[in-house]
């Protein structure tokens, strides 16, 4: 132990180690035996006697005890005993001993302690700064024995970082005791060499031993390179049987240490591989599948003969209960060399026939084509594969399967529609109905056909209409004078309407109000029914009277315009644009516009006049300032023929539009008529021009200016 603290002796006493400090022969402060042996003959005994007399009972009896068996630990404890005694007693005893030994010391100043500067002190200070609590005697033993124990990190950590030892442990003569090493299963590799960081920390320890460390490090590296590292994450699995020896050199297989899988070199896809084991060839063939994208070889599966796993080409039925459907992408393990013809002719024999497993040679084929276009191989293909040139035989011959349904369906049955099937069912139900029952009516005069049509039962209506048409009673009417065809039109059943017209229903029949089916369609806005009537009438060679009038003298086009005017009027009055009522009115507005367009497309005349007032459709649209319909009519090619048409009172459409009050679109309607050719100078039967019918007010003033042509020139486009 190094004595590094200052001893402040006010009495002028000097320590025992002053003489030793003067000699300058101490090479190691931990090996005191070497210090006593190298001291002068006159000073060593005296110093020893002085030290011995001052140490008391715990000190050795004579200097002769500093032999080879005198440990450094006892020397350190003796020095500690000398320092712990009172300074006065130590000085008195030394003064008595020195005259007796005949030694005269030179008087010096106050004692300042012993300071030794060498690499060992710096090393110990470095160890203390890094919290290495190793004892001094252990370091001395390692130094004197010249044993290099810094090569292995585990042993260094055990010696250096084991903590401060107790007093009883310091008295040991040998090296420090090692802790019992724990069994770590993860350390399956040779001990690792010191890292660069550890070498930087222990640079003072390894300066004198670089050569030996380099040799040891090279030996460890050589040992580590010779042995193949194996970790617990590595899984080496041999799928071969115990009796088989795997073929191939170690270079043909590479181990994936991270995933623990054994990979084979990339090769082409082989759907069938023959096992190299002779005894396995007799039992079953080895099946091995190796996709190209993963290059992983799963274990070849060995199949033995099992009646429950026999192959059968039929589906799971009572005739072949042993069939189990193979998984997607799995190939057939067996390739029978006998024909499937007996099985196809007699399915009951499939239970008693055992297909012997055979081995097929390797066939080169792409994996995608094999998985997607997979087909079972017939026996002729298996025979071809059994030949030596089977590697070039494609697996493209499909296996014919019998009809599993048992009852083959004819072409007519396959082409039957659902409606035809429903008609057959209804005919079977009405097979026992008499003619009187077909023609019977209820209290309202409705027959079975009227009720079926109102309910929308198309198949039943078709069967009833066909039976009643055979009796020439298809147009029989109920109490309102409506036939079944008119009921279907009012119910918006366009499919039933087309069926009835095809069977021969009259399209121009009228009800008790003089309305034809076209009037009903125009009033309700059933544009699809109009198209069905047109199509059915063309098929049955019937004439559709588009100019037929009801008892009010209105044609279907007039009725449609009046219905649309009512919707426009309601829309102008309603101030809530997003209310449900407004949404319903908008839908009805659209359907009515479509109906009017359909009527015009069918050939309805816009210039046709009603029977009571002589008004045209343009007059009716001008009465409500219906800009949408006015624009629709005036965009027709024949608009000039009816734009100035007069009613029975002599009024034109411009007279009607100019005389309106409290209409939002009145100004726009008058302007539109003037632009499309309306004559503002036309007079009615009362000799009135449109300007004479304009009401007073700010809107009237603007209308007058438009009628006089002043604002027309200002608003005219530049072209």
From Swiss-Prot:
Residues 322-394 are annotated as: Required for transcriptional activity. The keyword Kinase does not apply. A motif (Nuclear localization signal) lies at residues 164-179. One of its GO terms (cellular component) is cytoplasmic ribonucleoprotein granule. The keyword Cell inner membrane does not apply. InterPro entries: Ankyrin_rpt, Ankyrin_rpt-contain_sf, OCA. Induction: By LPS in polymorphonuclear cells, monocytes/macrophages and total lymphocytes, but not in T-lymphocytes (in vitro). By E.coli intramammary injection in peripheral blood leukocytes. GO terms for biological process: B cell proliferation; B cell receptor apoptotic signaling pathway; cellular response to interleukin-17; cellular response to lipopolysaccharide; cellular response to transforming growth factor beta stimulus; chromatin remodeling; chronic inflammatory response; cytokine-mediated signaling pathway. Residues 46-81 have a biased composition (Low complexity). Residues 84-97, 201-210 have a biased composition (Basic and acidic residues). It is found in: Nucleus. One of its GO terms (molecular function) is POU domain binding. Signal peptide: none annotated. Pfam families: Ank_2 (PF12796). Keywords: Activator, ANK repeat, Nucleus, Repeat, Transcription, Transcription regulation. Residues 108-130 form the OCA domain. Residues 405-719 are annotated as: Interaction with NFKB1/p50. ANK repeats lie at residues 444-473, 480-509, 513-542, 552-581, 583-608, 613-642, 649-682. Residues 46-97, 188-210, 289-343 are annotated as: Disordered. Involved in regulation of NF-kappa-B transcription factor complexes. Inhibits NF-kappa-B activity without affecting its nuclear translocation upon stimulation. Inhibits DNA-binding of RELA and NFKB1/p50, and of the NF-kappa-B p65-p50 heterodimer and the NF-kappa-B p50-p50 homodimer. Also seems to activate NF-kappa-B-mediated transcription. In vitro, upon association with NFKB1/p50 has transcriptional activation activity and, together with NFKB1/p50 and RELA, is recruited to LCN2 promoters. Promotes transcription of LCN2 and DEFB4. Interacts with NFKB1/p50. Interacts with RELA. Interacts with AKIRIN2. PANTHER family: ANKYRIN REPEAT FAMILY A, NF-KAPPA-B INHIBITOR ZETA. This is NF-kappa-B inhibitor zeta. The lineage of its organism: Eukaryota, Metazoa, Chordata, Craniata, Vertebrata.
